[in-house]
Amino acid sequence: MSNTTNQSWGGRFSEPTDAFVARFTASVDFDRRLYHHDIRGSIAHATMLERVGVLTADERDAILQGLGEIEQEIDAGTFEWSVDLEDVHMNLEARLTEKIGITGKKLHTGRSRNDQIATDIRLYLRDAIDVVDAELARLREGLIELAAREADTIMPGFTHLQTAQPVTFGHHLLAWQEMLARDHERLRDCRKRVNVMPLGAAALAGTTYPIDRHITAELLGFERPAENSLDAVSDRDFAIEFGAFASVLLMHMSRMSEELVLWTSAQFDFIDLPDRFCTGSSIMPQKKNPDVPELVRGKTGRVYGHLMGLLTLMKSQPLAYNKDNQEDKEPLFDTLDTVQGCLKAFADMVPAIEAKADNMFEAARKGFSTATDLADYLVRAGVAFRDAHEIVGQAVALGLREKKDLSEMTLDELRQFSDAIGEDVFEVLTLEGSVAARNHIGGTAPDQVRAAAQRARDALATLRQEA
């Protein structure tokens, strides 16, 4: 029976694929972005096949030359993609056969599209992770340097978005940096599990050809071949893991975004973003909108959605490969694009943030931010903490009635609540004294912030060297 489908798999079919079904099942519109990695995998596969004697040297050379020419065509925008050929693999193989004849049909020996696509995605994701890694390092560096610059800048620290205790702006920035440092570790761990090669697993059970998977793994830079052929072609947990990393990263970046949006508002007025990172209003001439952090905050939700989509995609699939897995690429690609874009935007923007130190300081003076310092003072004077808590609460109540901060009260006003209060109390009620007193590792004292920034610099430098 002749092939009536014009497909590589059409031998057992008696009629062509329905035109709508062909379009519905095709993936070339989105998986074509894998062409470079598909060609890399094919070059390694052909090289291995020649070394084990499945291909001749002339056949290998013809395949490698043909693949190189095809890559140039795609790069130049002259390659014609066909939906009828389903996917990136068959488009490239069909063009290779056009160029070099029957030898092109030998390339797929000992290989299935199942292990081919799993390999392509891992190659693509590995390269993309390296881009994300570099941008994340750049963002962290920007935060570290800004924190060192603002080590002495005092601002209110918040709980429940209510003034809690004074901190330094540098300390706050380093909190963000610590979150991103853990994200960086998660990314590096994810890359280790991405860097395992499925190629050679074939459809699901391996192949009868005398392949050497260690050769292809070495040529493609993989740490090792996958141990189990069924697992190699059927699971996408590595993509899910990247989606989980991306979700945690953007959760952190969304929290940063929320604060940046608040801080640029007239109600806070803590920072200024350069005009190049903001936009205006079509109707309100005065507006300067913090679009970059707002968009990062908004894009976080779509990355969460992609993670849930990938988890749901995989949850009920029997081994091994199923067509469901075609749906893994669009959410993964969009997650990658989104993460790379968000990181680049923030890495460019963060070093240009301008702190409005006077506004931050004045805000920290409101809300009785040194109340805990007064309680600690009383404890050091021998008052039990719970009693000290009650005493300071009464002092705060007076301040609310009189519209005075604790530091603005007279000694007599303070001593009406406790005889343990002396002249030296005012040293702990200043904002400068409050932050300076927290002079330990992890504390907000300016010297500790500078030391923490240096440790963060050193850790980031080590991480970059390990890449």
Swiss-Prot record:
GO biological process: arginine biosynthetic process via ornithine; L-arginine biosynthetic process
Top-level EC class: lyase
Keyword Cytoplasm: yes
GO CC annotations on file: cytosol
InterPro entries (alphabetical): Arg_succ_lyase_C, Argininosuccinate_lyase, Fumarase/histidase_N, Fumarate_lyase_CS, Fumarate_lyase_fam, Fumarate_lyase_N, L-Aspartase-like
Pfam family, one: ASL_C2
EC number: 4.3.2.1
Keyword Lyase carried by entry: yes
A molecular function GO annotation: argininosuccinate lyase activity
Pathway stated in the Swiss-Prot or TrEMBL entry: Amino-acid biosynthesis; L-arginine biosynthesis; L-arginine from L-ornithine and carbamoyl phosphate: step 3/3
CDD domains named in the record: Argininosuccinate_lyase
Superkingdom field: Bacteria
Reaction(s) the record says it catalyses: 2-(N(omega)-L-arginino)succinate = fumarate + L-arginine
Key words of the record: Amino-acid biosynthesis, Arginine biosynthesis, Cytoplasm, Lyase
Compartments where found: Cytoplasm
Sequence similarity: Belongs to the lyase 1 family. Argininosuccinate lyase subfamily.
Protein name (Swiss-Prot/TrEMBL): Argininosuccinate lyase
Gene from which the chain derives: argH
